[in-house]
Structures are given as C-alpha cells and as structure tokens.
C-alpha cells in the first residue's frame, strides 16, 4: 500500500497587486500592514471575497510574500482560494483587487461573490 501526499496549490499574488499593496502601505506609513484576503458567506452567489489591511498574523495563517509585502489568508478561506490569483486592476469600472478563482463554479457579474 502506498501513501500519497497532497500539497494544495498555492495562491498567486501578482506584481500589480503587490505594487498596489506596497503603495498603500507606504501611504499609511505602517510597514507592519499586510493585505488580508478572506471568504465569507453572502453575496449573490453564496460566498464573497473580502479584503482588509491587518498588522496581525495568526499561527495558522498562510502568508504569500512578493516584492517586500505580504498577503495573508486564514485556513478556512484558504480552502476556497487554493490555486487562485489575487490581482489589482484599473479600468473603466474603477480600480480594485480581484480574484481569479479556478475553484469557483459560478461568479456574479461584479466578481466579488462566487459559488463552489
């Protein structure tokens, strides 16, 4: 009998998102700030993404570092975000952090909620 080890796919933190986080952290003047991404119940598709800045990191958080800044995800949210890409986009609809999530079966028109 063989045992297989499963390693979850990571979370991609793009150059554009890292640069925006870096700019916002510099504006605040607090180098301890990290972008926290989380998933909560709600939205038109069942789950919704949330973003906040946080100084604290829990022992079981996943941390993705890029270009001197950090993205933090709690374990409950990570199970929905494994393999996803966190990006920052500017366009006619405004500018925002966006998540491209291969785990999402459906998403709403604005892209802030999804279902599995």
Swiss-Prot record:
**Pfam families annotated for this entry?**
Fe-S_biosyn
Q: What cofactor does its activity depend on?
A: iron-sulfur cluster
Q: What does the UniProt keyword field contain?
A: Iron, Iron-sulfur, Metal-binding
> Carries keyword Metal-binding?
yes
Cofactor: bound how, per the entry note? Answer: Binds 1 iron-sulfur cluster per subunit.
Top-level taxon in the UniProt lineage: Bacteria
May I ask which residue range the UniProt record assigns to the signal sequence?
A: none
Q: Give each disulfide bond as a residue pair.
A: none
Q: One GO cellular component term, please give it.
A: cytosol
Care to name a GO molecular-function term for this sequence?
iron ion binding
The answer to whether the entry has keyword Iron is yes
Its transmembrane ranges are none
GO annotation (BP), single: iron-sulfur cluster assembly
Q: Which residues bind iron-sulfur cluster?
A: 44, 108, 110
Assembly and interaction partners: Homodimer.
Family per UniProt?
Belongs to the HesB/IscA family.
What the protein does comes down to: Required for insertion of 4Fe-4S clusters for at least IspG.
Annotated protein name in UniProt: Iron-sulfur cluster insertion protein ErpA
